[in-house]
Amino acid sequence: MLNIDLTGKRAFVAGVADDGGFGFAIAKQLAEAGATVSVGTWPPAYGIFTKLIQLGKIKNSLVLARGGDLKFERIFPFDADFDTMADVPAEIRENRRYKEHSDYTIQGVADLFVKEFGEKPLDIVVHSLANGPEVKKPLLETSRKGYLAAVSASSYSFVSLARSFGPLLRPNGAFLNLTYLAAERVVPGYGGGMSSAKAALESDTRTLSFEVGRKYGARVNSISAGAWASRAASAIGFIEKMVEFSRRNSPLGQSIEPLEVGNAAAFLLSPLASGITGSVVYVDKGMNVMATPVEV
């Protein structure tokens, strides 16, 4: 029997703040395969997420099919907008949701991994992060500040993650990020520079597959996930319509489930995918192949 076995592997999933998104599903399926999992949570959501766990509000979501419950090794406050604390503006440092944490930057969390778990503590790093403050604006109406903020948070953050966490990976490590079809097709309403950010993320995946592969011996891949009405995606404003559109028009006539993205991620991050790097893998019920809606 061919099984995905991640026993003895340690993973970090950046971008988990509830139990409803792809990041949580990936973390859970990595744990199902035997990995030890830590997550990074946006500081303003950190207290809420940790309380949800402590109070048992998401206990059903933590139940593993193999038995037992998902227990995160660590939940790190994590803001991928900042590489180091020197990059954090004073108004953020003094914000009550940030000031209780000593370091929540990309390099800071990488350093904490080494401090707590020693040299080369990781095997898997997942980037499940995106933010576009002007996502509801058409590209023509997007400000320079909003556009650059989308690219910084949604794509450059992966470059920074690879730079800071690459040295922490043990042999045959793997990186993974999440993209969306808007990187290559027009999705009206998905604005604010987010389509550009996803296109950059996919391009960076290819470039980093070479650079990270040669420097750290690690693989770098991307999953292009179908539309899903997560709490984070609700910021787009029309996500429910996109989910229904995908259900009606995908080759399988279904909408995606987070578990399916989690399963694909577990495979891509496992030794079974040792020959796959620099790839964008579609997990969208085949929506990416459709040129027109079913009913034109």
Regions found by a protein language model. Give the residues of each.
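Short, small/polar-rich loop/turn modules that mediate ligand/substrate recognition or access, typified
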Residues: 217-219, 276-278
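Conserved mid-core segment of classical short-chain dehydrogenase/reductases
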Residues: 51-150, 167, 183, 189-190, ...
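Catalytic loop of short-chain dehydrogenase/reductase
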Residues: 15-24, 42, 130-215, 224-230, ...
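Short C-terminal tail/terminal secondary-structure segment
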Residues: 266, 277-296
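A glycine/serine/threonine-rich, flexible loop-to-helix segment
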Residues: 54-55, 192, 215, 222-251, ...
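Conserved SDR Rossmann-fold cofactor-binding beta-strand/turn motif
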Residues: 219-229, 269, 282-284
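A conserved structural motif in NAD(P)-dependent oxidoreductases
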Residues: 101-104, 250-261, 272
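Canonical Rossmann dinucleotide-binding motif of NAD(H)/NADP(H)-dependent dehydrogenases/reductases
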Residues: 3-47
